[in-house]
Amino acid sequence: MTFDLTNAKERMKGAQEALQRELANIRTGRANPNILNRVEVEYYGAMTPLNQVASISVPEARILLITPFDKSALEAIVHAINVSDLGLNPASDGNIVRLAIPQMTEERRKELAKEVKAEAEKAKVSVRNVRRDIMDDIKKDKDMPEDDARKAEDQTQKLTDENIKAIDEIAAEKEKELLTI
């Protein structure tokens, strides 16, 4: 009898995907529309994600161009960006909003690299929690022969190691992107 690790694989993969979503929101020195994913605009009385009220393009390496679908939302878009924690100053010409992405200081890059490490650690903790849950399930299964239990524990550990390694690679890639000028 083999122990089914499908649920564990899905949950560990979910931790990696959550990490990638979080890291996409951390801005680098280049313009990336993903940094605006968390910005919500008050549009007709409801908080609406920015990408649902405007198109976002990257005409140059350090410029984001935000074109509202409805010109009446322009002021709300500017306000939403100003109150966000992005630290960017939007410039509006009445039709579009330009966002110049400033060059990051070395200090800010290191600060963001620490944030990347913290997010990676959260993902690793999540993976380890899945491992702990599976190990507990294996120990609770009294019908499972000892050899099968040992094999299932080894498979779980191997799966955990693979996911931790993948998380480290994702974080290292983002850190490299941040620290490269």
From Swiss-Prot:
A GO term, aspect molecular function: ribosomal large subunit binding
Location of region: Disordered: 135-160
Subcellular localization, as worded in the UniProt entry: Cytoplasm
InterPro entries in alphabetical order: Ribosome_recyc_fac, Ribosome_recyc_fac_dom, RRF_sf
Keywords: Cytoplasm, Protein biosynthesis
Keyword Cytoplasm: yes
Single Gene Ontology BP annotation: translational termination
CDD domains: RRF (cd00520)
Record-level GO cellular component terms: cytoplasm
Keyword Transcription regulation belongs to the record: no
UniProt cross-references to SUPFAM superfamilies, sorted A to Z: Ribosome recycling factor, RRF
HAMAP family: RRF (MF_00040)
Family membership: Belongs to the RRF family.
Job of this protein: Responsible for the release of ribosomes from messenger RNA at the termination of protein biosynthesis. May increase the efficiency of translation by recycling ribosomes from one round of translation to another.
Protein name, per record: Ribosome-recycling factor
Lineage: Bacteria, Bacillati, Bacillota, Bacilli, Lactobacillales
